[in-house]
Structure formats: C-alpha cells, structure tokens
C-alpha cells in the first residue's frame, strides 16, 4: 500500500489549519489561561506548603504543563464520520482507492503536526519561562515519555474512532462525544492529577483507558514508574489501542451494511 495519498491528505490538513491564524492564537491563549487557573487553584490549596502527601507543587505544575501541552496537539476530529454521513460524501469517499480510516487518521495527524509546531512549542516555551517544570528523571525517561505520548495519542484516537462508529445509528453524536470528552478531562489526570484521587478510584480508573492518554506519559517523565510497572504501562496502552480499534472496526462493518446517507 502506497503512503503517498495519505501523506497528501496530511499535508492538506496541515495547510488548511495554517489559514486560520486567529483561531491558532486564540488556542494558545486558551491553553495558557487554563494553565494559569489550574496552577493558581492548586497554589491556594497547597497554602504555601511545598508538598502534600509526598506530591510537590513542582510535580503538580509539571503535570499540568505537560498534560495541557499534549492536549494542545492531540487532535482528533470526533465528527469526521458523522459529518460525511450527514452531507452524503461518505458514499463517494468509500469508492476511492484509499482506506477511509487511513484518510481519517492522516487528516488528524496533519492537524496534530501543525498544532505540535505552532501551538505546543510556543505554549511550552511560555509555560517554561513563567512557571518552569521539573526536568525529566533521566534521558531514557524522556525518550520513553515521548514513546508513551505517541501511544497515548493512539489511545485517544482509537477511542474517538470507536465512538464515531455510533454515527451509523445516531443522527447526532454530540451527546456521546461530549460525555466521552468529560470523562477524558476528569479521568485522564490532565484536570485533576490522579495522585489526589482516593485509592479505590485510582484502581477503578486503572481498568479504563483514560489514564493511558496523559497520566502515564507524565508519570514516566517524572520517573514515578519504572521496571515492571513501566512495562505494564506500555502494555496497557497497546492493549487499549487494540481493543478500541477491534470494537471500532466491528461497528464499522455492521454500520456499512445498513448505511443510510443523510442529505444529498
């Protein structure tokens, strides 16, 4: 299978995003405002203390900066399929000699690359200047963090892929996408560091894919997990990517059989 068409789709998506400069700057501003709010809330909660239950304020700030940084370019289009079902273009796209899912991924990766260069980098630069973050535990930890971040994006994308398949049976998937994103925000550790969750809640979250998106990469960066626990974190990410994709393709195959195009 030639990668050329998918590279072209990714390039097109990259260039399309570059046309919306105001949206780009507002996105950076939004991320920085959220970061300031989160940090100030926890500074108040810490009440001048440097550590609470072994969790330092520096660790909390690092968690927020890295999580929001990753979130800024972890781009998925939750409505890619539903929009094409609604306007009828799905019928034409499925006839093209390229994988529909490959095109979906390519479009998202093109946007993610744009966000990485023009959103993540400047946001992280400003955050480092005004807040500072802990250095990675070691060079290997930083490299493993990058690998885990890639797998974290894989979990996020696969989850979106699965939920998008419900578009075949629902006229509007906004409600379930909103619910999914609420769970991601709360349970991934980006909004509330999972260190502060009750142990029973952390164990329950551990059986879900949510902490594999942001929290696992951050834990690796900080050197909080190593050895068998580190290996388990990677295995868990790979398992969730596989499980979500398997169920996603099962729904895709069922949905194609009863495809009803809304619109023209």
Per-region residue spans from a language model:
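Hydrophobic transmembrane alpha-helices and immediately adjacent juxtamembrane helices
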Residues: 1-264
């Amino acid at each position: 299978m030639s990668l050329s068409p998918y590279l072209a789709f990714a390039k097109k998506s990259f260039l399309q995003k570059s046309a919306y400069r105001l949206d780009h700057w507002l996105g950076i501003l939004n991320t920085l405002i959220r970061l300031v709010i989160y940090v100030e809330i926890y500074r108040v909660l810490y009440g001048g203390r440097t550590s609470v239950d072994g969790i330092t304020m520096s660790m909390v700030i690092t968690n927020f900066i890295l999580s929001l940084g990753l979130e800024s370019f972890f781009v998925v289009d939750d409505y890619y399929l539903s929009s094409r079902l609604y306007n009828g273009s799905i019928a034409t796209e499925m006839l093209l000699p390229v994988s529909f899912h490959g095109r979906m991924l390519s479009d998202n990766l093109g946007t993610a690359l744009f966000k990485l260069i023009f959103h993540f980098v400047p946001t992280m630069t400003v955050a480092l200047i005004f807040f500072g973050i802990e250095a990675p535990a070691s060079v290997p930890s930083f490299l493993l963090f990058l690998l885990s971040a890639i797998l974290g994006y894989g979990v996020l994308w696969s989850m979106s892929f699965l939920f998008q398949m419900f578009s075949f049976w629902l006229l509007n998937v906004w409600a379930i996408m909103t619910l999914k994103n609420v769970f991601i925000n709360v349970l991934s550790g980006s909004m509330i560091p999972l260190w502060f969750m009750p142990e029973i809640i952390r164990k329950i979250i551990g059986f879900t894919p949510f902490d594999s998106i942001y929290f696992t990469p951050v834990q690796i960066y900080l050197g909080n997990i190593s050895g068998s626990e580190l290996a388990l974190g990677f295995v868990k990410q790979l398992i969730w990517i596989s499980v979500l994709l398997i169920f996603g393709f099962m729904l895709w195959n069922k949905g194609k059989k009863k495809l009803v195009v809304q619109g023209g």
